[in-house]
Amino acid sequence: MSRSRQPPLVTGISPNEGIPWTKVTIRGENLGTGPTDLIGLTICGHNCLLTAEWMSASKIVCRVGQAKNDKGDIIVTTKSGGRGTSTVSFKLLKPEKIGILDQSAVWVDEMNYYDMRTDRNKGIPPLSLRPANPLGIEIEKCKLPQKNLEVLFHGMSADFTSENFSAAWYLIENHSNTSFEQLKMAVTNLKRQANKKSEGSLAYVKGGLSTFFEAQDALSAIHQKLEADGTEKVEGSMTQKLENVLNRASNTADTLFQEVLGRKDKADSTRNALNVLQRFKFLFNLPLNIKRNIQKGDYDVVINDYEKAKSLFGKTEVQVFKKYYAEVEAGIEDLRELLLKKLLETPSTLHDQKRYIRYLSDLHAPGDPAWQCIGAQHKWTLKLMQDCKEGHMKSLKGNPGPHSPMLDLDNDARPSVLGHLSQTASLKRGSSFQSGRDDTWRYKTPHRVAFVEKLTKLVLSQLPNFWKLWISYVNGSLFSETAEKSGQIERSKNVRQRQNDFKKMIQEVMHSLVKLIRGALLPFSLREGDGRQYGGWEVQAELSGQWLAHVIQTIRLTYESLTALEIPNDMLQIIQDLILDLRIHCIMVTLQHTAEEIKRLAEKEDWIVDNEGLTSLPCQFEQSIVHSLQSLKGVVDCKPGEASVFQQPKTQEEVCQLCISIMQVFIYCLEQLSTKPDADIDTTHLSVDVSSPDLFGSIHEDFGLTSEQRLLIVLSNCCYLERHTFLNIAEHFEKHNFQGIEKITQVSMASLKELDQRLFENYIELKADPIVGSLETGIYAGYFDWKDCLPPAGVRNYLKEALVNIIAVHAEVFTISKELVPRVLARVIEAVSEELSRLMQCVSSFSRNGALQARLEICALRDTVAIYLTPESRSSFKQALEALPQLASGADKKLLEELLNKFKSSMHLQLTCFQAASPTVMKT
């Protein structure tokens, strides 16, 4: 099977010779496609794959190993190309041996040069020392290549301790430039060194020979004397006689000096007693000194004295010392109890706690005082948190309402929180948000907000020291050096056992903090069993969205401070869950309050119309929503580690429904405004743009609004809401990352269009019905009969009255909104044309004059309102004309044209409004 690539070919290696472990660079062709493709690399028969580093298809770097062959090829094997070949070779040099006393830049493995096992416990032969310069003359290293020397002296060595030593090689390598005279001197030195080595041991033996003989003679004489005395039977041997003599001499001496020795012993005893009192005054005074130093608080002095006494008298058997040492131990036990009591006192600083723990550690107090301190601090923190809640609840019962605790603005540790609150509070909410509010509102903190502020400050004042105390307990810095060394194993065991317990303590503090905040702000999220302990707040009113945002920022800063202590995230996750719930609650409350404020916008409607036929209501509505969303920006935005408030589908749906309800509340306000009785609306003036040249007439300030005018104003507002406001609000929702925007827009638009259509139909009914109703009466006024009538002299008055009424509608609509004119007039004309068609179709027959009169009036009306005709009205006019007989002669057509021109000329001024340029007819 042929391979996909050519076999590797090594064409170069640098360097091409060296000792084992020399780093070489191999170059060639097809050396592999990657590190995993390289499966073999041998140099001089030694596998170097472990040290190989594949650089590219033409380069590999490795180290030469301990090969057996002095010279060999470089073979590369790859998966893709198989076993390769080499055009170059590498020569492996033997490493130069370094003498015992020679300086070397690398660490020398002496076991490779000397066999220490064979040299142990015996003299070192002279040759094993291998002097660095056996000839005794200056060494000058040869500059000839080692390779040439090896070729010249094949199989030989320059090492003079080697079996294949070559003197010529040695001289060429070390003394190539040495003169012959110096070499002769070197031979003399070499002979002298050899003689010294052979004569040294002989001289040592000769010098001590007489001493050896004298020692031998003495030992022989002693041996002979002992053997001779051993045969005698008088008073035993010589040693027994010597013992008797010595005993008699001792007894005689005691008798002579008994009195003197007695006095000496008594003096020595007295002197020793005084020395003991002076020497051990430290121990005898120590119990009293311990009491005094404890009273002064010099615990370090007491501990040092105790350690000294313990080392001197801890294991004494002297009764006096044991008595006084027992008193010392009793005083130290009292000190242990005192220090433990001070350690467990609360409140206490971290410095004092560490100091007392170190004292107790030095005194080898039983148990684990450091852990007892941690437990006491934990209970104290929980008690402070509960007391904080009870204190605020008592304050709330004693000082309800306006007497709320004030925020300490000057001493607050978190100015950014108050800055955020001030920035949020300063948002202008339009006219509807300014009533009944003064500048002092931001300094009146609700009780529950003040409670959260104080609670978080309390936790941040206690927990850092609590955490640092645990860290010191873990790393052993609480204990002294001696205590750390003596109890290190036991303490490590305790730390492993205490880790889970401490984790539970931290979690208990976190749970208590979160539940207390939930009890104050989110009581519905507590379990039934926790409600009494953590809840119980008398909530008179729901917190505003701004205060909730302030609380969220406070808790966020608390979380950041706890994270800075390097507390594990799993212990702080419960705070993140609380922040998420508060963010969702803040959004809900803000949107609900926004809906309430928008509901009150109807009370602020002033009915002042601008040039576009709009009041300030749509703008106020948009501003209200925009300011609400701006106040929620910091709440909706996610801080590091926080989840999105819209991650849960349930939350998305609730927020979407609240947004829809806000839009529908405003739509309901518009409907209420359109149907409100005249007496309930203050419309003492109506302001319009009187500068428009198309205005039919000026409206004075004392003009009262009618129900039809209110309908028109609301319709104009509806049109603006549909084209601009609702779309702008959708963009603001999207900008603030709200979800379900399409649904909000669709539902809101549908409700708005429904209201618009209903109000439009009401207005058309109010305006079109009277005009339509007057047509039939006007046509048949004066017993007019289509079968028997005079030749037409012009358009009759009923049609002129209808046109005047239509002009009045035009004027009324134009006064409010120019854009509504085509839509309203088109529907009115549809109704009029439909009625006119019906009346014409009901006539059984027309006379020649009657047909001409009817055609004149229908054409006059149609031509007058031509710019407002719709397909429906054109169809009605067509049906009306089709119901008439055709004109009999050209004279009738001429008469019809003359009468039409006369009508248009006589009513030119009145019909001007129908001739003005008009936008495309709007929807009906």
From Swiss-Prot:
Positions of modified residues (Phosphoserine): 431-432, 435
Residues modified to Phosphothreonine: 440
N6-acetyllysine PTM sites in chain numbering: 454
Coiled-coil regions listed: 240-260
Record-annotated disulphide pairs: none
UniProt-listed GO biological process terms: exocytosis; Golgi to plasma membrane transport; protein transport; regulation of entry of bacterium into host cell; vesicle docking involved in exocytosis
InterPro entries attached to this UniProt entry: EXOC2/Sec5 (IPR029175), EXOC2/Sec5_N_dom (IPR039481), Ig-like_fold (IPR013783), Ig_E-set (IPR014756), IPT_dom (IPR002909)
Keyword vocabulary terms for this entry: Acetylation, Coiled coil, Exocytosis, Phosphoprotein, Protein transport, Transport
Ranges where the IPT/TIG domain occurs: 8-93
Location (main, coarse): other
UniProt-annotated location(s): Midbody, Midbody ring
Keyword Coiled coil found: yes
Listed GO MF terms: protein kinase binding; small GTPase binding
Similarity section: Belongs to the SEC5 family.
Function recorded in the entry: Component of the exocyst complex involved in the docking of exocytic vesicles with fusion sites on the plasma membrane.
Entry's free-text remark on domains: Interacts with RALA through the TIG domain.
Protein name: Exocyst complex component 2
Gene name tied to this protein: Exoc2
